[in-house]
């Protein structure tokens, strides 16, 4: 409403929401909430090759403007492999209602199995005032004697489960419609087993990440002319950073190159 009040178009980064239209169990899609256009990364949550994405709009005038500008910025040598993957993905979505129904059933089952974890915690809609995508299983380690990064490491090395990302206080397990009931059983079994070996308390190896910025020595573009070295994070106080410090790209960095 604010955008439209001022004559602006609203473009939503809905990269992780390409699966939203296919079940009422997921949040409402951006275009249904008033957005003029949205970007959907098919490869993140649907069966499509990496790099495949869609730019969708419900505004015919905006569609014409986008088409004109795409002619300027798009490559003249598109990948027909990627475009074919997009078409295959869309065909799958149109003809796989039962798959999405089964997927949502598996998501609810795994959450039911994990609701009684003693030290780890699975976030759900009751933990936020915002809508929540149940396809992303957020595992909090805030009240356990283990960090999120360590939990992700154990899941990878001991259970062959690769998580989407790990942070000091949580892990995100990204799921998709292509995950099987067996895969969800593996995840729940692994977390129940790990939880049984934990105790209450904060992990002593966690590094506080708040208020790291203390000043700026150089612009990032000036750093190429200086020598650089790799040192432990604990020894970096008052040193100039030569790279970004962030939990994941393209997230907001805590420190950028040139800062102290």
Q: Model segments located where?
A:
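Conserved PLP-enzyme active-site core in the AAT-like
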Residues: 1-123
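Conserved C-terminal alpha-helix-loop-beta "cap" of PLP-dependent enzymes
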Residues: 115-259
């Amino acid at each position: 409403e604010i955008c439209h009040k001022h004559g602006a178009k609203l473009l939503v980064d809905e990269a992780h929401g390409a699966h939203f239209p296919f079940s009422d169990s997921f949040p409402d899609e951006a275009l249904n909430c008033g957005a003029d256009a949205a970007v959907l990364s098919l490869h993140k949550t649907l069966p499509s090759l990496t790099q495949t994405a869609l730019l969708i709009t419900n505004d015919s005038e905006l569609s014409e403007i986008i088409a004109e500008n795409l002619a300027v910025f798009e490559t003249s040598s598109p990948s027909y492999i990627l475009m074919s993957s997009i078409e295959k993905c869309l065909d799958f979505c149109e003809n796989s209602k039962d798959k999405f129904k089964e997927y949502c059933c598996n998501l609810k089952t795994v959450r039911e199995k994990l609701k009684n974890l003693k030290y780890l915690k699975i976030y759900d809609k009751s933990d936020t005032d915002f809508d929540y995508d149940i396809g992303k299983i957020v595992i909090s380690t805030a009240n356990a004697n283990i960090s999120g990064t360590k939990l992700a490491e154990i899941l990878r090395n001991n259970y062959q489960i690769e998580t989407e990302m790990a942070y000091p206080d949580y892990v995100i397990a990204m799921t998709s419609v292509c995950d099987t009931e067996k895969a969800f059983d593996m995840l729940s079994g692994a977390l129940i087993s790990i939880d049984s070996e934990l105790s209450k308390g904060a992990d002593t190896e966690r590094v506080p990440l708040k208020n790291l910025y203390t000043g700026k020595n150089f612009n990032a573009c000036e750093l190429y002319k200086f020598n650089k070295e790799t040192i432990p994070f604990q020894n970096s106080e008052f040193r100039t950073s030569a790279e970004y410090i962030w939990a994941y790209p393209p997230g907001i960095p805590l420190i950028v190159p040139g800062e102290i």
